[in-house]
Amino acid sequence: MVSKDQTSFNKRWTLGLLMLGLVIILWVLSSFLINLIFEDDSYRKPFFITYTNTAAFIFYLFPTAKAVVVNYKDTGRANVHRELIMEEEGTGSDSNRSVDMTSPLLTNLEAGTHANQKKRLTLYETIKLSAEFCILWFTANLVTNASLAFTSVASQTILSTTSSFFTLFIGAICHVESLSKSKVLGSFISFVGIIMVTKSDSHQRYQRHIADVSGDDNDAVQVLIGNLLALAGAVLYGVYSTLLKREVGDETRVNMKIFFGFVGLFNLLFLWPSLIVLDFFGWEPFSLPKDPKVVVIIFVNCLITFVSDFCWAKAMLLTSPLTVTVGLSITIPLAMFGDVIFKHKTMSALYLFGATLILGSFFIINKSSEEEHFENSITASNYESVEVPAANN
């Protein structure tokens, strides 16, 4: 029986890692696409693009909308609330059954407590959570997209993947994560790497434009702004992840499709006035894309965001949030490789060393977290072996 549980657990964990790999590829591809239309000023509209991408989450509600239409044709009543509850509770029941039938380890990857003791979020609680995190989610993605208008994809990717560094300390402040010497050491090494990458990228861009007569002396400042925006995105991701974990606890307690669907709906309904404000003050003049290439890129990027965020949520359920966050550091060499291949960029020794430090810091943090996860898994397994016979009696 134990062997079957372990085999099933390994299969689900492997599936989670495969989905994480897909997320990594899609996120880097999305960064290159956005950078492509920002770099040549063909359509530098970070707010509108982020608004469109986030609004695309509303398609997660389409299966429920379809069920409402079918129910209306059959009974003459729409009953939207009933269909939403069925989607929320029905998916939740299947999800919980799947976890119970495979391994108790899946429900105790982070907290070390028994997930079945926690009640699943109701429909109202899920919608409320979506409303609370809509602005924070949107702002995090906005500053990340905006950073691509000023800095390289490689630098943006490296700085964005430092989110685990901020998640660790913000989580410790909120009593969500525990600090250890290994985690602090890894975070310090990551911080040193950030300084090296930022300094190298700004210096290289500045030197290229000093040599170019038509270059702008302020370009180094723009690169620094881009790096700071990417860093701000990492901080906001850390805040978002920590607060979400504190509110939800176990990620299996929330239906991610309903959650993301209402994030998209609230974004669509409440953030459109910002487009008017940005246009009025001239910060981002509103205009729809006219170039077919830009239209295709924006559409493809919407699809990428839609698919990658679903895979990201599933990967978190199949593995653990920390595993996913640390695993996203693989985007660093992938983005750097893309810059070398597609843009023929050269990486300085300082840049490469800084990137190596950041990547190495994640291995240190991951090793420490893995040991904690193993201890929590053993505790959960022992708890399950005691509770199940008691329940049968």
From Swiss-Prot:
Signal peptide: none annotated. Keywords: Membrane, Phosphoprotein, Transmembrane, Transmembrane helix, Vacuole. Residues 1-17, 68-132, 177-182, 241-257, 314-321, 367-393 are cytoplasmic. It is a multi-pass membrane protein. The chain crosses the membrane at residues 18-38, 47-67, 133-153, 157-176, 183-200, 220-240, 258-278, 293-313, 322-342, 346-366. GO terms for cellular component: fungal-type vacuole membrane. Residues 39-46, 154-156, 201-219, 279-292, 343-345 are vacuolar. The modification Phosphoserine is found at residue 93. It is found in: Vacuole membrane. PANTHER family: SOLUTE CARRIER FAMILY 35 MEMBER F5, SOLUTE CARRIER FAMILY 35, MEMBER F5. Present with 2010 molecules/cell in log phase SD medium. Belongs to the TPT transporter family. This is Uncharacterized vacuolar membrane protein YML018C. It comes from Saccharomyces cerevisiae (strain ATCC 204508 / S288c) (Baker's yeast).
